[in-house]
């Protein structure tokens, strides 16, 4: 890349005080919301995409005449007046300091020094980043509330406009005439029921003593109760007459409530909640949206909250001496046990606040609570998923900022710490692996402190997490010399599908050639010849003694992979990135055709075909993760998810969610495909135990109480 040594416009640059280059939450285009090729204007707070995306940064220059912009990921500086990249700095050295600060923010390492010898800690007081600041969290809290309010207002206005138009249309007039007579009948029935209720109450009141004396008697007794109750613990019981009146009025109210056809409805469709991009976190947002829309996975974590038993055991152990209390040492050991394979130990904080950027306030209306860190010293991804899903499926928020989820990921999966762009497939594998380890550790550590019901629930959820994506492959190697077949069973949690050979070389005409996911599955299960005589066949070497001096017989062989056990949720990872050169990975940008329904029967072994019914091979598309961009280390992730509550597809682009059709989904450039088995091997459509299905459809009503306890 050629660049200018000197640019007079950079030399004249005065860095704006409100520039957005150091704010990871603003590293997305304000117009199209992409996180690929993001340029921050250094003369104002504007952030937009480059000319190879939608040219929104160029349009900003044409409108504002601000010439200098910084690419926040690669840290290039570009001058639009010179139309070239520049290398020089201004007299105060702002660009050099910006680059060093950006590197510190991305890596979350603030221990490098400036020219004056001071530590570079401008973005945080501790080891965590800008998003942990109270001011930033309060600002995003207000923005989340405002976004939801505006979304609700637009929805109401659009509904009024549509109803006005529909009532004036011929179809609308016909619809209004049909139920007119039915409405009259319903009104008459309601009026009759109300009159009967009034007569009943009136008859009960007439059979009691006069209302005046009753009122005076009740007033006198209530006054005595109010005065005496301050000094005497026991309250004077009210008169039977008054109790009867109160019970009658309560019955009347409950009857009216039950008769009322008006029910509380969620503000938004449950699940249609955007996740704010906290700084190149589109990979995390797309994966979380997909997992929350998988019915089985969501119901498990709506039901399970690991922090509940931690709090309960901690309080119970202070009362009894049967077991030692859950101390900091115990919690630290559990965290250390979780991280022993990765060598990363979570640091303990002395004061921690609440769990997610979402929650409930008093009453029905929920308020987002922006925490610094999770609520417990035991950092739990399961707890953060539980809390996040509670808010996303409460039907109350159009946008939520998953601060605590990102914080927990940073602590427990250190490879994803910082604001660098990451791969969604790698994050999904690491997240599921960490969740599985956490459930196993929690279920086996300190079993005496965990209630039996909670241990049973943890075991059930662990069983679902282990089996929802788990399948088995039959690896069959055939010796070409004696035709002996050697079978090996291998587990899998996803199928990584390679593109056919014609897409493995660079060329301009490759992108125009069609490719189908069924073709990639056929390539995955096709017979592959092993190169040369490299196979040690047991049959050919059976006559050779174990300690014989004769050489081992090597033969030619062929290998084939077939599916012998189908998972309930099938993950297909399309290997779009290939190595080009020594250190470069380029993307295969060809469109892969896929259907809403997938039949896996052609890719299974014979034994599986005989043991399963035909409908067990049918899968329905549930979600699609897309990668926008050209390179492995850059780009933007979005997801298409099927919302079972609303019965429609939704495109999840960080904070922006929009309904879409199946045709739009099938046109997407898929990176990860999620298919759900229509009927399981047991003949059921769900893998969940009845205990998990009970009362966990969606937390519209429960979120007001349970979320308030968790998040406040």
From Swiss-Prot:
Family: Belongs to the peptidase C19 family. USP44 subfamily.
Enzyme class: hydrolase
Known role: Deubiquitinase that plays a key regulatory role in the spindle assembly checkpoint or mitotic checkpoint by preventing premature anaphase onset. Acts by specifically mediating deubiquitination of CDC20, a negative regulator of the anaphase promoting complex/cyclosome (APC/C). Deubiquitination of CDC20 leads to stabilize the MAD2L1-CDC20-APC/C ternary complex (also named mitotic checkpoint complex), thereby preventing premature activation of the APC/C. Promotes association of MAD2L1 with CDC20 and reinforces the spindle assembly checkpoint.
Residues of the USP domain: 273-678
Segments of this protein annotated with the region Disordered: 690-712
GO molecular function terms listed in the Swiss-Prot or TrEMBL record: cysteine-type deubiquitinase activity; deubiquitinase activity; zinc ion binding
GO cellular-component term (any): mitotic spindle
Protein name: Ubiquitin carboxyl-terminal hydrolase 44
Modified residues (Phosphoserine): 169, 239, 401
Source species, domain of life: Eukaryota
EC number: 3.4.19.12
Catalytic machinery residues: 282, 636
Quaternary structure, from the entry: Interacts with the N-CoR components TBL1X and TBL1XR1.
Source organism: Homo sapiens (Human)
Subcellular location field: Nucleus; Cytoplasm
Subcellular location, principal: nucleus
């Amino acid at each position: 890349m050629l660049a200018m040594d000197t640019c007079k416009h950079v030399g004249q640059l005065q860095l704006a005080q409100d520039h957005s280059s150091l704010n990871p939450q603003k590293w997305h285009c304000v117009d199209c919301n992409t996180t690929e090729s993001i340029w921050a204007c250094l003369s104002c707070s504007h952030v937009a995409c480059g000319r190879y995306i939608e040219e929104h940064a160029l349009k900003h220059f044409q409108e504002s005449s601000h010439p200098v912009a910084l690419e926040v990921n690669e840290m290039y500086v570009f001058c639009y007046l010179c139309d070239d990249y520049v290398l020089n700095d201004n007299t105060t050295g702002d660009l050099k300091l910006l680059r060093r600060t950006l590197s510190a923010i991305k890596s979350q390492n603030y221990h490098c020094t400036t020219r004056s010898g001071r530590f570079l800690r401008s973005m945080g007081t501790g080891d965590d980043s800008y998003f942990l600041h109270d001011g930033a969290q309060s600002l995003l809290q207000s923005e989340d509330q405002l976004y939801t309010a505006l979304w609700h207002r637009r929805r109401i206005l659009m509904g009024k406009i549509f109803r006005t138009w529909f009532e004036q249309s011929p179809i609308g007039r016909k619809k209004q005439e049909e139920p007119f007579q039915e409405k009259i009948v319903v009104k008459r029935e309601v009026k009759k029921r109300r009159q009967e209720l009034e007569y009943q109450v009136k008859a009960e009141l007439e059979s009691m003593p006069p209302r005046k004396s009753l009122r005076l008697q009740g007033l006198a007794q209530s006054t005595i109760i109010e005065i005496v109750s301050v000094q005497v613990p026991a309250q004077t019981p009210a008169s039977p007459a008054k109790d009867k009146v109160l019970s009658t009025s309560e019955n009347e109210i409950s009857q009216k409530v039950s008769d009322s056809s008006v029910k509380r409805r969620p503000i938004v469709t449950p699940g249609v909640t955007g996740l704010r991009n906290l700084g190149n976190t589109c990979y995390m947002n797309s994966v979380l949206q997909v997992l929350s829309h998988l019915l089985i996975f969501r119901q498990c974590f709506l039901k399970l909250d690991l922090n509940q038993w931690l709090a309960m055991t901690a309080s119970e152990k202070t009362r009894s001496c049967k077991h030692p209390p859950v101390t900091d040492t115990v919690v630290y050991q559990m965290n250390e046990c979780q991280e022993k394979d990765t060598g990363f130990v979570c640091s303990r904080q002395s004061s921690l606040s609440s769990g997610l950027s979402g929650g409930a306030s008093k009453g029905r209306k929920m308020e987002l609570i922006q925490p610094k860190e999770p609520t417990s010293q035991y950092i739990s991804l399961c707890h953060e998923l539980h809390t996040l899903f509670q808010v996303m499926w409460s039907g109350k928020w159009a946008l939520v900022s998953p601060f605590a989820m990102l914080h927990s990921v940073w602590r427990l999966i250190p490879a994803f710490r910082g604001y660098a762009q990451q791969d969604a497939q790698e994050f999904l594998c690491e997240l599921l692996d960490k969740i599985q380890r956490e459930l196993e550790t929690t279920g086996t550590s300190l079993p005496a402190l965990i209630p039996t019901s909670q241990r049973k629930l943890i075991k059930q959820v662990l069983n679902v997490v282990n089996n929802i994506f788990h399948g088995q492959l039959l690896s069959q190697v055939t010796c070409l010399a004696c035709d002996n077949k050697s079978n090996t069973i291998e587990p899998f949690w996803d199928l990584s599908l390679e593109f056919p050979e014609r897409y493995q070389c660079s060329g301009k005409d490759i992108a125009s050639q069609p490719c189908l996911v069924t073709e990639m599955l056929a390539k995955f299960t096709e017979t592959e010849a092993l190169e040369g005589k490299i196979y040690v066949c047991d049959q050919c070497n059976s006559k050779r003694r174990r300690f014989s001096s004769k050489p081992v017989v090597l033969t030619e062989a062929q290998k084939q992979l077939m599916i012998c056990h189908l998972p309930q949720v099938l993950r297909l990872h399309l290997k779009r990135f290939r190595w080009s050169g020594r250190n470069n990975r380029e993307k295969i940008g060809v469109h892969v055709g896929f259907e809403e329904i997938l039949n896996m029967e052609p890719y299974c072994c014979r034994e599986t075909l005989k043991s399963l019914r035909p409908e067990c091979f049918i899968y329905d598309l549930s979600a699609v993760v897309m990668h926008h961009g050209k390179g492995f280390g850059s780009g933007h992730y979005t997801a298409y998810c099927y919302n079972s509550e609303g019965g429609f597809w939704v495109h999840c682009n960080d904070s922006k969610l929009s309904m879409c059709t199946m045709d739009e989904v099938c046109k997407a450039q898929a990176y990860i495909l999620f298919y759900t088995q229509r009927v399981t091997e047991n003949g059921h459509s769900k893998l969940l135990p009845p205990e998990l299905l009970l009362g966990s459809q969606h937390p519209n009503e429960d979120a007001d109480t349970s979320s308030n306890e968790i998040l406040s």
